Amino acid sequence: MKEPPVQLDLPDNPWLELRRLTPARIALGRTGTSIPTNAQLDFQFAHAQARDAVHLPFDPAGLSSQLAERGRDSLLLHSAAADRHSYLQRPDLGRRLSDESAQALRDHASANPGGVDLAVVVADGLSALAVHKHTLPFLTRMEEQTHAEGWSLSPVILVEQGRVAVADEIGQLLGAKMVVILIGERPGLSSPDSLGLYFTYNPKVGLTDAYRNCISNVRLEGLSYGMAAHRLLYLMREACRRQLSGVNLKDEAQVQTLESDDPDLMKGNFLLSSPDD
């Protein structure tokens, strides 16, 4: 008589439940001493997406048109990096404007004297995909709050082949009290479209990262647009009060928690947010 198959009493894997809560690669399983084929293919696909995000061309003209439809002026500038190859090989060139762009910005500042509270800069960085996807919805949320508090803003400065520090030169040339740059972050294997915000008080050429505050991972699966705008406005208020930014200015904005009963305070957690937040 044939013996019945042995029923193995396998232990529960608590990681499987956690997989649905994060895009991180956990509980992949294994096949022999390797990971399953599907997990390997998924990894290779994510790596290809990250590489594509770095080389995706920025479309400043298209973004400028979308801003114009919403009633926002913009200026199209270029860093000193002539192309993507130069940008990747020479980070220093991405931190400064080209001579032509710097002069164009001086001309704009001369025609519009008086400066502004906040210069708004958008640069492709290492992920134009992030900029294309998240700039407009974030600016909408940010400008709702800056308008309510009476802050004056510059036109949106669109910089091709730009790095974080290019915002300091732009803020200085515009005579801005503060500057924020929206820039595509280095793509990760689970986040090829992550937008970063870098904020500086009293911007000028030559400042280091120690003088900047960073708000990172702005995207639907990360920090919501509303919460990112909330944190930025907090930094703006505190920077003006204390006249500084960077390592000496801590982000102590109200942090949203899972235990909060206020639905408006739940928008910073991607587990509880709707796609429209």
Swiss-Prot record:
Keyword Cytoplasm (UniProt): no
Compartment list: Bacterial microcompartment
EC number: 4.3.1.7
Main subcellular location: other
InterPro entries (alphabetical): EutC (IPR009246), EutC_C (IPR042251), EutC_N (IPR042255)
Catalytic activity reported: ethanolamine = acetaldehyde + NH4(+)
Keywords noted in UniProt: Bacterial microcompartment, Cobalamin, Cobalt, Lyase
Pathway(s) served: Amine and polyamine degradation; ethanolamine degradation
Molecular function GO terms recorded: cobalamin binding; ethanolamine ammonia-lyase activity
Note accompanying the cofactor annotation: Binds between the large and small subunits.
BP term (GO), one: amino acid metabolic process
GO CC, any one term: ethanolamine ammonia-lyase complex
Origin superkingdom: Bacteria
A Pfam family recorded for this sequence: EutC
Amino acids binding adenosylcob(III)alamin: V164, E185, C214
Cofactor: adenosylcob(III)alamin
Stored HAMAP family: EutC
Family of the protein in this entry: Belongs to the EutC family.
Role played: Catalyzes the deamination of various vicinal amino-alcohols to oxo compounds. Allows this organism to utilize ethanolamine as the sole source of nitrogen and carbon in the presence of external vitamin B12.
Subunit-structure text: The basic unit is a heterodimer which dimerizes to form tetramers. The heterotetramers trimerize; 6 large subunits form a core ring with 6 small subunits projecting outwards.
NCBIfam families reported for this sequence: PRK05465.1 (NF003971)
Protein's UniProt name: Ethanolamine ammonia-lyase small subunit
